[in-house]
């Protein structure tokens, strides 16, 4: 876990310090280790990941159960003492991270991607660029459980 957590902190800092990938407290990253999902805390900056504790441990099984019930408001930090010490709360995108099968998930807000996404012909533009890649276009939905469900159903 220590090496993986160090890798998470390092890549989070790298992308958090690149204005083309992340602006302010936007974007989030996560690491899955056994039944724990370490996800960036709400309101924290990825660029602070080396010098500050910005990750929150949550129970992956609980997140999955809450996704099924459409209610992430019941999500609690896995280690209550951890939350009391650091006053951190999981990102609104915790469900999205839990649904992804990958050990590491990097959810960024790349300026170039966003500028294409808002174009009236953005989807057609992306179709030309990614014709040999398996991908999905998700029309805008609110962040959180709605986005996670849209991705899950795509």
For each of these PLM feature ranges, what is it?
Residues 1-154:
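Glycine-rich flexible loops
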């Amino acid at each position: 876990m220590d090496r993986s957590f160090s890798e998470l902190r390092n890549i989070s800092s790298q992308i958090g310090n690149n204005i083309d990938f992340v602006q302010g407290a936007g974007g989030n990253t996560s690491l899955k280790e056994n039944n724990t999902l370490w996800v960036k805390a709400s309101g924290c900056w990825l660029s602070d990941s080396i010098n500050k504790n910005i990750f929150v441990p949550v129970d992956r099984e609980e997140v999955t159960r809450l996704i099924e019930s459409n209610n992430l408001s019941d999500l609690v930090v896995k280690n209550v003492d951890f939350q009391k010490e650091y006053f951190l709360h999981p990102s609104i995108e915790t469900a999205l991270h839990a649904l992804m099968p990958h050990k590491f998930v990097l959810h960024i807000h790349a300026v170039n991607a966003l500028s294409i996404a808002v174009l009236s012909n953005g989807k057609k533009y992306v179709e030309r660029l990614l014709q040999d890649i398996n991908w999905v276009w998700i029309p805008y939905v609110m962040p959180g459980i709605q986005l996670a469900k849209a991705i899950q159903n795509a």
